[in-house]
Design a protein with these regions (language model features):
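Arg/Lys-rich amphipathic alpha helix in sigma70-family domain 2
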Residues: 50-57, 67-88, 100, 104, ...
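Structural recognition of an alpha-helix C-terminal capping motif at a helix-to-coil junction
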Residues: 25, 39-46, 59-71
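Short, charged helix-capping/linker segments at alpha-helix termini
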Residues: 5-14, 24-43, 155, 178-179
Length: 190
């Protein structure tokens, strides 16, 4: 980011190429409806570009990027909530109700699509702080200290949120899929 700030356009291309996949996966899991992830993704990179001249090295670029993403997701939900308040018959609410009905799968064997749906539903049922910590960890690839910097809480709080999120996800997936689920992140060190 420092090289980009100093005028090296190729440096930005490298940053974008390195971080676009994990960032987009993180946003796909955070944003509802899923189509909103593309808009939030654009907003994140727009803010990175806009902050070019003001950028100061305080942490790793990845931490800087996910802090922006964290704020953009919060802005997305604030805007969505305002729109919902303005219209009582929300199309989104109707779509959510239909989507939840689609998660009831009677088959004993679980297809990848069913597993994806079950994971999406289980993630949506987590408290926001736990979901955010889990997605920053799993999709963003951030460590405990980086998540603590992004979210503004101590690393031990992040660790606690991750443990609660994992326990709830295990239970929810076991209930939904009728099978034992092993979710064990390998890098839960501080």
């Amino acid at each position: 980011m420092e090289r980009y700030r100093d005028g090296d356009a190729v440096a930005f291309e490298r940053l974008y190429a390195r971080h676009k996949g994990p960032l987009y996966r993180y946003l796909l899991r955070q944003c509802h409806p899923r189509e909103a992830a593309a808009d939030v993704f654009q907003e994140v990179w727009s803010r990175v570009i806009a902050s070019r001249d003001r950028y100061e090295v305080r942490a790793a670029f990845k931490t800087f990027l996910y802090r922006i993403a964290h704020h953009c997701v919060a802005d997305h939900y604030r805007l969505r909530d305002r729109k919902r308040e303005n219209r009582m018959d929300s199309v989104d609410d109707h779509e959510e109700a239909l989507a939840v009905q689609g998660y009831e799968q009677p088959e004993a064997r679980v297809s990848q699509a069913q597993l994806d749906d079950a994971v999406r539903l289980a993630l949506s049922e987590l408290p926001e702080e736990q979901r955010n910590a889990f997605l920053l960890f799993e999709e963003g690839g951030l460590g405990l200290k980086e998540i603590a910097e992004v979210t503004g809480v101590p690393a031990e709080t992040v660790k606690s949120r991750l443990r609660f999120a994992l326990a709830k996800l295990r239970r929810a997936l076991a209930d939904d899929l009728g099978m034992r689920v092993t979710l064990q992140p390998a890098r839960m060190e501080t």
